[in-house]
Amino acid sequence: MADNKTTATELLERLHKMAIFRLSLGSKELFHSNFLEYLWDCDKESFKEIIRNLCGDNQVLTADQKYFISREKENFDVCIYHTSNNEEDGKAVYDVIIENKVKSIPYKEQLAEYVGKVADKKQEKSPAYLLLSLAKDFPDKEDEEIKDTWKVVHYGTLRDAIWAQEKWRSEPFVEEYCDFIKTLDELGAAILDGMDREYLFPNVEDYKKERLHDLYIKMRCSWFATALKTELGKNIDKRKIRIVSKYEERLPDCVNLNVAMNQGNGQIAAWICDRNMNTFEIVIQGDQYRHGINQIGIKKSKSKEIENDYYQVKENDRASFKHFVLNWLYGRLENLQDVNAYYFLNFLDDFNCFNSNQSDIRPESKKEKVYYFRKTKTPKAGPFDCYSDDYIYRYVSISNCTVHTLRDKMLNDILRIFYNLPDLS
């Protein structure tokens, strides 16, 4: 962990002065793969020793045969392999697979895909799988499939292993590289230090200058999602909590958690689906906390149009308001089965701990509020919004909400909708 006296600002300034850091910005993960290949070329035996130490297996890369290293071969970040004819372009038998996750979040599905790709080759012996991660914790880290197959190695550990090879210290760039990843490791710790007491993204602008804002956002989102998953596991069967890399991977009767960058903002999403894949979502995106409903096969409402781009409804007419929202969601009024869908969206009044932007609710008069439902795909600030005919959401601002409070709120909302899923059939 970073020294308490070394602030994130000081670490960013230290990185700024490193030429090797500037060179890494072109492709952060490919850069590290390239440097591993460079170390292999410097001294193969020392590199093999490092791999054995990191894998915790003294039998790796010990056979009396010629080994080769490659980057991006069959989409593996780095692989070490041998061939039956001892020629580099021969049929590869993989001995070590290395996956780099410097700025990205490891996902079980992606890692399982790599393992499956090797399994399809029906090798006599499985390779060693090494996952290099800057984040010490990520949502899928404790998954049994990952723990049984992949050796997760933190970049700080990689730095120590490289520096322990004294013969490498005189090689060009090795000292600079070790100093670079040591500083990056300390910065990663500083990014998360005291996070539970802070806002979710309070200092993102500080990282943009060094083009590290994506790293800052992803690490904090990953930490948040990991903590959220842990708390969910105390209330829901852990087999029903899934980490997914994209919306299309969600499954019914599960809490599908996603961490991503969306339009330059950090996103932490919980997608809960019924058997028809109608989806209720609880999403943090940037400084917004959203509840949304995405219904399959919805048709456009024939409600009265206003201003060419909006539907209008008055809140004081409660029956009309509910029917409008639900009719808009479901397409046909006669299909309405459960008004809980409306109450799922109507959550602003429960957010006393958040600073709701009251300007988002535009009053037509002092006595009643008028809501505008956007019909176009371009979002507009408002208490309700939509991107298409089948998706509506509502949001509040969370710019002044601590991570601890936000996590508890999201946890409670997920449990509420998971155990009381509205019927959209």
Positions of PLM-derived features:
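Charge-dense, extended regions
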Residues: 384-425
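A short acidic/basic microdomain associated with nuclease active sites
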Residues: 47-73, 246-248, 254-260
